Amino acid sequence: MASKNMVNPAVEPSMEDDLFAREVAEVKQWWSDPRWRYTKRPFTAEQIVSKRGNLKIEYPSNAQSKKLWKILEGRFQKRDASYTYGCLEPTMVTQMAKYLDTVYVSGWQSSSTASSSDEPGPDLADYPYTTVPNKVSHLFMAQLFHDRKQRHERLSAPKSERSKLQNIDYLRPIIADADTGHGGLTAVMKLTKLFIEKGAAGIHIEDQAPGTKKCGHMAGKVLVPINEHINRLVAIRAQADIMGVDLLAIARTDAEAATLITTSIDPRDHAFILGCTNPSLQPLADLMNTAEQSGKTGDQLQAIEDEWMAKANLKRFDDAVVDVINSSSSIRNPKDVAAKYLQAAKGKSNREARAIASSLGVPEIFFDWDSPRTREGYFRIKGGCDCAINRAIAYAPYADAIWMESKLPDYEQAKEFAEGVHAVYPEQKLAYNLSPSFNWKTAMPRDEQETYIRRLAGLGYCWQFITLAGLHTTALISDRFARAYSEVGMRAYGELVQEPEMELGVDVVKHQKWSGATYVDELQKMVTGGVSSTAAMGKGVTEDQFH
């Protein structure tokens, strides 16, 4: 008869509570680090540790996150900036590493060039949510490989010769685009987990609604309420804490140009929601439904909506109150009353603001924010820099950096935003999108373009990035080379590619060596005792022509 198979438990029951208490103490010690001095966590160390498994895993993302924090902390304190751009593929990441200290992975670029479904499209975040983490992995694995390759080359040379060899830090921290999180809070947590597993040092997440997400420079953006986006930021931090990683969370707000919001549930959003001030109009949705049922379509429906909107006289509630104050014959000193109202109503809910107006003797105000709601049920909102500042202040305790998406590279607006945030949180790091969607030639003269990053850095924008520079530079050289190649054949390759590579010392000119052929030969020789008749870089390799 076979003996009973004894299987060990996952953890010794007599030690379980002691191990838990020890790990909780370690987490509390971790959270006491100055790194977290501005971070608010609405959960406990006990809750975090209880969500971990018994096997402790050390993620490379943690080392990269610490490195990124050190970079941004140093830049912010010196009112300097780390600036980078969206990287497309491994060739690009190795060239960026020579000159830039961070790497960006764009959702827009991934959507158009690297969807995990292989179906390209615009930046609507409708690609599988593994897409951007997979691109992070693609680049991070390349970073690790080229770091190994370079280290081997240096250690294979005498110390006296190493000054002639490259000593590039290929392990530049990667910051990636998490869009809106691709779903609810558990989706945000799973996405965060993927980014950490793939090697990201930081991620940014925006306050748009997931089903209607748009590129920051498209129309039709729909915001979620402030509390919903805070929950996303908390979800990111909680997941990173469970995994023991210092991942940076960057909060992006699209409030500057947004026109819609999903709900009026958060009082912090109330001051920016638009209401109809014309009591003679029926609700827009009712009007549109009636028109549809009568057979109207397309342009006819649009004309009906446009006419309704023109008559509705949509306003923020505060603006409606001030207009009533200024037009009321019963109010003496309307300027003083308006100032008192605006000061008292700041940050208040609509119900509270109505009560304040009434207490100051303001006549009853007709203001209906349900009447203009869209067919999808969204409320209309008047965005702007003030709306973005309001949201940034709410996000600050939960975010390592904050980014306001903007329509133009407007220094004065960037200054207004920075000063608004820093009036409440002076140590808040800021990020800025140096977008290729802007027409830089018409936006500012060349000398101002050259100083723009530096001027923004002085305001606290310590991380700046061109989202799609990888895409545009690839398109530019591809168009230029393809055109010339079609006209002059191999002369185009020599003049436009190979000769400039050699003159500028671009290492990819020796593409076999760049790809790691020498390194892999040495791996093979190590295994076979030092000799390999099939070495890739042996006698006859054509790269000898470039010595």
Curated annotation (Swiss-Prot):
Its cofactor is Mg(2+). Mg(2+) binds at residue 177. Its main location: other. InterPro entries: Isocitrate_lyase (IPR006254), Isocitrate_lyase_ph_CS (IPR018523), Pyrv/PenolPyrv_kinase-like_dom (IPR015813), Pyrv_kinase-like_dom_sf (IPR040442). The active site is at residue 215. It catalyses: D-threo-isocitrate = glyoxylate + succinate; (2S,3R)-3-hydroxybutane-1,2,3-tricarboxylate = pyruvate + succinate. Its EC number is 4.1.3.1, 4.1.3.30. SUPFAM superfamilies: Phosphoenolpyruvate/pyruvate domain. Keywords: Glyoxylate bypass, Glyoxysome, Lyase, Magnesium, Metal-binding, Peroxisome, Tricarboxylic acid cycle. It is found in: Glyoxysome. Belongs to the isocitrate lyase/PEP mutase superfamily. Isocitrate lyase family. This is Isocitrate lyase. It comes from Pyricularia oryzae (strain Y34) (Rice blast fungus).
